[in-house]
Amino acid sequence: MCIRDSPYTLLVAVMLSAQTTDKKVNEVTPFLFDLADSPQKMAMMEVEEIHSIIREIGLAPTKARNLKKMAQQIIQSGGAIRPDWEFLESLAGVGHKTAGVVMSQAFGIPAFPVDTHIHRLADRWGLSNGKNVAKTEYDLKKVFPEDTWNRRHLQIIFFGREYCPARGHDLSECPICSWASTKKRIKEGR
């Protein structure tokens, strides 16, 4: 089963992705989805069983509890994930960014999910001087047309991984940073 096979599997993968690498998520999700590719199956699992599958993921104990509770909440709400911000953000372990990824990637609804990586890049590139991800999301939504938000979110992530990593960042390696820093120096009169 692929992570993007359903809104549910996408939601689970995004919930697992916090504080860990995509590589780790991609390693554990096939085993998890073999046993629990629906909220109904996840709700039937014991927290300890979920934890044993995802133990290599950061914050695994909390995520295991949240996955079970989230599945139970979905069942109590009709059994399916709906494209509804309030519903998604009411689920255990689901914040605004996770809800945004599901809204944009599973349902095609314009959203601009901002995590710490996009927040850092938007600041480096001069697209936002936001002190938090909510302000950065607001700024990016003003910079980019709404019909581009879903793909811009992904483009920023992939571009950042390739040219503008958090660690070992070299201004000369990132075309945007080299341009943005030159623009900033000109503005500051250097």
Question: What are the language-model segments listed below?
Answer:
Residues 4-190:
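Catalytic cores of DNA base-excision repair glycosylases
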